[in-house]
């Protein structure tokens, strides 16, 4: 192990001079020797080497606040990448990017550690899966079903309900699912992390969840690496032969942190100011989130869509890696329909008659066709009114409006805001309900009976009271 000295500080990016023959490798972790008493900088501050500039100088990014750093301070090379604790001792704990506990519950009692940079599983180790994962959310189970061991993205702009949807999925899947979960909070609000922790605690599933946070207020180094920290913990459980749920909120902030770091390192930006290595960074992370023959990782990732533009390079790069995409729409949220999932924009590789069965496939396609017809007729209705439509079109519009309202559902996690108890709807009930609407069995019921109910029987009961 060699020691070096800081020669330049520019925000979180620090240049460190080492002896020429003892330069640390790329991604090696370095620690500050002088911190703590001698200055107000963080004690034992960790850096990660990003570039070797030459002449013994390396450029590193700080994994913590770089306040109080100055030239000449001594830095020690650890000779290995950042490693974090893994295994059962991490369950029920909240950790930061370096795997240090931040929940005031004492140290993490495990000797087992693993480097956060790992190669993706080899091609012959991968295990594709076609088992469906029931979420209890009607619109998702019907139009964009999830696969066990698959990858799911929740896409949406600001304030359309990504985090609430994510929390409901955690509530419905993680509590029913007997396996373990890992939650990585990447560059999101600290308040949401706090809410998540208390929710898990109240529902007594905290002992099955490991939580890693690198929130909005932290330097870009933390936000860039915290997804890898969470993933490393999930991989360790997977390699023991377990089935893991891996939640990431939010993948966009991972990209954004990469953009900040890239600019600080002096790389030329590419389209829209993103880092030139955007596709490679995303690929490195996403290729590791996968199921092997030993165990499975089912990942659910929230993806912020800047300015509601799905063609922005960051969400567009994320799309490539996913099995199911759940697109949240501001127009649907404006109608007061929650979850605001767009059934025409959301897709799933699992929506195939060989996977979900013929009945499910046909009902889902009927629902989409009816909604698509309504979308096409909307301009005519706006100009000429409903009276000018043919009887078939009037019927299609009436059914589409019922379907649209029946796609809404009260959530368990939103009970405090809505006052209506959350509903978990089994897949069979979902298919039966939409089949009845599409076949015309419920044409006589008013459309408001279908709004914010669980199963179709509740809608029929509600219609009697109207």
From Swiss-Prot:
Signal peptide: none annotated. InterPro entries: AAA+_ATPase (IPR003593), ATP-synt_VA_C (IPR055190), ATP_synth_F1_bsu (IPR005722), ATPase_a/bsu_AS (IPR020003), ATPase_alpha/beta_chains (IPR050053), ATPase_F1/V1/A1_a/bsu_N (IPR004100), ATPase_F1/V1/A1_a/bsu_N_sf (IPR036121), ATPase_F1/V1/A1_a/bsu_nucl-bd (IPR000194). One of its GO terms (cellular component) is proton-transporting ATP synthase complex. ATP binds at residues 156-163. It is a peripheral membrane protein. Its EC number is 7.1.2.2. Keywords: ATP synthesis, ATP-binding, Cell inner membrane, Cell membrane, CF(1), Hydrogen ion transport, Ion transport, Membrane, Nucleotide-binding, Translocase, Transport. It is found in: Cell inner membrane. It holds the Pfam family ATP-synt_ab_N. It catalyses: ATP + H2O + 4 H(+)(in) = ADP + phosphate + 5 H(+)(out). CDD domains: ATP-synt_F1_beta_C, ATP-synt_F1_beta_N, F1-ATPase_beta_CD. GO terms for molecular function: ATP binding; ATP hydrolysis activity; proton-transporting ATP synthase activity, rotational mechanism. SUPFAM superfamilies: C-terminal domain of alpha and beta subunits of F1 ATP synthase, N-terminal domain of alpha and beta subunits of F1 ATP synthase, P-loop containing nucleoside triphosphate hydrolases. Coiled coil: none annotated. Produces ATP from ADP in the presence of a proton gradient across the membrane. The catalytic sites are hosted primarily by the beta subunits. Belongs to the ATPase alpha/beta chains family. F-type ATPases have 2 components, CF(1) - the catalytic core - and CF(0) - the membrane proton channel. CF(1) has five subunits: alpha(3), beta(3), gamma(1), delta(1), epsilon(1). CF(0) has three main subunits: a(1), b(2) and c(9-12). The alpha and beta chains form an alternating ring which encloses part of the gamma chain. CF(1) is attached to CF(0) by a central stalk formed by the gamma and epsilon chains, while a peripheral stalk is formed by the delta and b chains. This is ATP synthase subunit beta. It comes from Polynucleobacter necessarius subsp. necessarius (strain STIR1). The lineage of its organism: Bacteria, Pseudomonadati, Pseudomonadota, Betaproteobacteria, Burkholderiales. The gene is atpD.
